[in-house]
Protein backbone atom coordinates (compact mmCIF):
# COMPACT_ATOMS: atom_id res chain seq x y z
CA UNK A 1 0.00 0.00 0.00
CA UNK A 2 1.46 3.39 -0.98
CA UNK A 3 2.51 5.76 1.77
CA UNK A 4 1.72 9.37 0.88
CA UNK A 5 4.48 10.74 3.11
CA UNK A 6 7.32 8.25 2.65
CA UNK A 7 6.95 7.38 -1.05
CA UNK A 8 7.72 10.91 -2.37
CA UNK A 9 10.86 11.02 -0.22
CA UNK A 10 11.92 7.57 -1.44
CA UNK A 11 11.42 8.72 -5.05
CA UNK A 12 13.51 11.82 -4.33
CA UNK A 13 16.21 9.59 -2.82
CA UNK A 14 16.13 7.32 -5.87
CA UNK A 15 16.49 10.39 -8.13
CA UNK A 16 19.58 11.43 -6.12
CA UNK A 17 21.04 7.96 -6.50
CA UNK A 18 20.46 7.93 -10.26
CA UNK A 19 21.87 11.40 -10.91
CA UNK A 20 25.47 12.54 -10.90
CA UNK A 21 24.61 15.35 -8.48
CA UNK A 22 25.34 14.17 -4.94
CA UNK A 23 24.87 17.51 -3.17
CA UNK A 24 21.34 16.93 -1.78
CA UNK A 25 22.05 13.27 -0.93
CA UNK A 26 22.68 13.65 2.81
CA UNK A 27 19.62 15.82 3.44
CA UNK A 28 17.32 13.62 1.38
CA UNK A 29 18.71 10.43 2.96
CA UNK A 30 18.24 11.68 6.53
CA UNK A 31 14.75 13.08 5.87
CA UNK A 32 13.63 9.83 4.22
CA UNK A 33 15.19 7.77 7.01
CA UNK A 34 13.44 9.81 9.72
CA UNK A 35 10.05 9.43 8.01
CA UNK A 36 10.65 5.71 7.43
CA UNK A 37 11.30 5.29 11.16
CA UNK A 38 7.96 6.97 11.87
CA UNK A 39 5.76 5.13 9.41
CA UNK A 40 7.39 1.73 8.86
CA UNK A 41 7.25 -0.78 11.72
CA UNK A 42 10.19 -2.81 10.36
CA UNK A 43 12.40 0.28 10.23
CA UNK A 44 11.36 1.24 13.73
CA UNK A 45 12.13 -2.27 14.98
CA UNK A 46 15.63 -2.03 13.49
CA UNK A 47 16.48 0.84 15.86
CA UNK A 48 14.53 -0.36 18.89
CA UNK A 49 16.66 0.22 21.96
CA UNK A 50 19.39 1.94 19.95
CA UNK A 51 20.76 5.27 21.16
CA UNK A 52 23.18 7.16 18.96
CA UNK A 53 24.15 10.63 17.83
CA UNK A 54 25.78 11.15 14.42
CA UNK A 55 27.31 14.32 13.01
CA UNK A 56 28.08 14.49 9.28
CA UNK A 57 30.01 17.41 7.80
CA UNK A 58 32.44 18.53 5.13
CA UNK A 59 35.79 20.00 6.23
CA UNK A 60 34.62 23.50 5.23
CA UNK A 61 31.31 22.91 7.09
CA UNK A 62 29.28 23.98 4.03
CA UNK A 63 27.43 20.65 4.16
CA UNK A 64 26.43 19.21 7.51
CA UNK A 65 23.71 17.37 9.37
CA UNK A 66 23.01 15.65 12.65
CA UNK A 67 20.99 12.47 13.22
CA UNK A 68 19.91 11.40 16.70
CA UNK A 69 18.47 7.96 17.44
CA UNK A 70 16.70 7.20 20.69
CA UNK A 71 13.53 5.58 21.95
CA UNK A 72 12.79 3.92 18.57
CA UNK A 73 12.76 7.36 16.93
CA UNK A 74 15.10 9.42 14.83
CA UNK A 75 15.43 13.19 14.70
CA UNK A 76 17.34 15.17 12.10
CA UNK A 77 18.95 18.60 12.02
CA UNK A 78 20.22 19.97 8.73
CA UNK A 79 23.31 21.34 10.37
CA UNK A 80 26.25 19.77 12.17
CA UNK A 81 25.62 20.15 15.91
CA UNK A 82 28.58 19.05 18.02
CA UNK A 83 26.90 19.38 21.44
CA UNK A 84 26.07 17.22 23.24
CA UNK A 85 29.02 15.06 22.24
CA UNK A 86 28.18 12.78 19.26
CA UNK A 87 28.96 9.05 19.28
CA UNK A 88 30.54 9.47 15.86
CA UNK A 89 31.48 12.43 13.69
CA UNK A 90 31.98 11.76 9.99
CA UNK A 91 33.87 14.40 8.05
CA UNK A 92 33.62 13.62 4.35
CA UNK A 93 35.58 15.10 1.45
CA UNK A 94 32.42 15.69 -0.58
CA UNK A 95 28.84 14.37 -0.70
CA UNK A 96 29.72 11.88 -3.46
CA UNK A 97 32.37 10.24 -1.23
CA UNK A 98 29.83 9.84 1.58
CA UNK A 99 27.22 8.46 -0.80
CA UNK A 100 29.64 5.89 -2.20
CA UNK A 101 30.66 4.77 1.29
CA UNK A 102 27.19 4.47 2.79
CA UNK A 103 25.53 2.79 -0.16
CA UNK A 104 28.24 0.28 -1.01
CA UNK A 105 27.21 -3.36 -0.69
CA UNK A 106 30.33 -3.87 1.42
CA UNK A 107 31.34 -0.50 2.89
CA UNK A 108 35.13 -0.19 2.89
CA UNK A 109 35.51 2.32 5.67
CA UNK A 110 39.23 1.70 6.12
CA UNK A 111 39.83 2.16 2.37
CA UNK A 112 37.80 5.38 2.38
CA UNK A 113 39.81 6.63 5.34
CA UNK A 114 43.11 5.75 3.65
CA UNK A 115 42.02 7.60 0.49
CA UNK A 116 41.05 10.50 2.77
CA UNK A 117 37.47 10.43 1.48
CA UNK A 118 36.23 10.33 5.08
CA UNK A 119 37.58 10.95 8.54
CA UNK A 120 35.76 9.28 11.42
CA UNK A 121 35.97 10.43 15.00
CA UNK A 122 34.23 8.02 17.37
CA UNK A 123 32.97 4.46 17.35
CA UNK A 124 33.21 2.90 13.86
CA UNK A 125 30.44 0.41 14.69
CA UNK A 126 27.98 3.31 14.72
CA UNK A 127 28.94 4.19 11.17
CA UNK A 128 28.56 0.59 10.01
CA UNK A 129 25.10 0.50 11.58
CA UNK A 130 24.15 3.74 9.82
CA UNK A 131 25.42 2.34 6.51
CA UNK A 132 23.20 -0.72 7.05
CA UNK A 133 20.17 1.54 7.60
CA UNK A 134 21.06 3.61 4.52
CA UNK A 135 21.32 0.46 2.36
CA UNK A 136 17.95 -0.72 3.65
CA UNK A 137 16.44 2.64 2.71
CA UNK A 138 18.09 2.43 -0.72
CA UNK A 139 16.38 -0.94 -1.27
CA UNK A 140 13.05 0.57 -0.21
CA UNK A 141 13.58 3.43 -2.69
CA UNK A 142 14.39 0.98 -5.50
CA UNK A 143 11.15 -0.91 -4.87
CA UNK A 144 9.17 2.34 -4.73
CA UNK A 145 10.50 3.72 -8.04
PLM ranges: what are they?
Residues 1-145:
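Feature captures hydrophobic
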